[in-house]
């Protein structure tokens, strides 16, 4: 509570703009006076002041940048308490609440997954499905005249090579890696 106004900050990871917008839609508080937010996903960033004068969205974005975070969305909700805070007070309130929420939030390292695409003839599809199930991997499939194209994301750390080797062995070399 700052000068009788109540501020609540909510933060979450967001791997895409769609995830950020879904989080904002789910956590926005319609009864609040303002729902200001900011998010950063790689080079993409956005912020909104939600009608609050003196641009509180930018201090929220600054809190994200000062914390050195990426792929994150922060929503700050204000319930007006009757006292106007002025330009500096709004910047400190929104930015400070956002910074505190980010400081307290659990953090995880960002991992860039390896994308792999390969094709196999139809007789090998069942074997490929079995290996992917055994390794708890999901793949997008596209059916082509000569077989099936699989596109999957593998965790970083060298998993791609062993997985492709196992698939190649399983299909007796009848696997064509794209790219």
UniProtKB/Swiss-Prot annotation:
- TM regions (residue ranges): none
Q: Which residues form a coiled coil?
A: none
- Quote the PROSITE patterns the UniProt record gives: UPF0029
Q: Give the matching InterPro entries.
A: EFG_III/V, Impact, Impact_N, Impact_N_sf, Ribosomal_Su5_D2-typ_SF, UPF0029_Impact_CS
- SUPFAM superfamilies, per this entry? EF-G C-terminal domain-like, Ribosomal protein S5 domain 2-like
Gene Ontology cellular-component terms listed? cytoplasm
Superkingdom is Bacteria
User: For this chain's UniProt record, which GO biological process terms are given?
Assistant: regulation of translational initiation
User: Which family is this protein grouped under?
Assistant: Belongs to the IMPACT family.
Which protein, by its recorded name, is this?
IMPACT family member in pol 5'region
* Lineage of the organism: Bacteria, Thermotogati, Deinococcota, Deinococci, Thermales
């Amino acid at each position: 509570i700052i000068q009788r106004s109540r501020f609540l900050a909510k933060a979450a990871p967001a791997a895409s703009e769609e995830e950020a917008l879904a989080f904002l839609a789910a956590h926005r508080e319609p009864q609040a006076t303002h729902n200001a937010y900011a998010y950063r996903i790689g080079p993409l960033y956005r912020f909104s002041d939600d009608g609050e004068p003196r641009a509180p969205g930018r201090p929220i974005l600054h809190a994200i940048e000062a914390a050195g975070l990426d792929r994150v969305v922060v929503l700050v909700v204000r319930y007006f308490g009757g006292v106007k805070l002025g330009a500096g007070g709004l910047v400190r309130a929104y930015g400070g609440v956002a910074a505190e929420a980010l400081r307290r939030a659990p953090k995880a390292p960002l991992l860039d997954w390896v994308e792999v695409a390969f094709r196999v003839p139809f007789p090998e599809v069942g074997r490929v499905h079995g290996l992917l199930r055994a390794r708890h991997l999901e793949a997008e499939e596209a059916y082509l005249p000569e077989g099936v194209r699989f596109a999957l994301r593998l965790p970083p750390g060298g998993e791609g090579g062993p997985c492709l080797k196992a698939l190649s062995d399983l299909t007796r070399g009848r696997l064509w890696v794209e790219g």
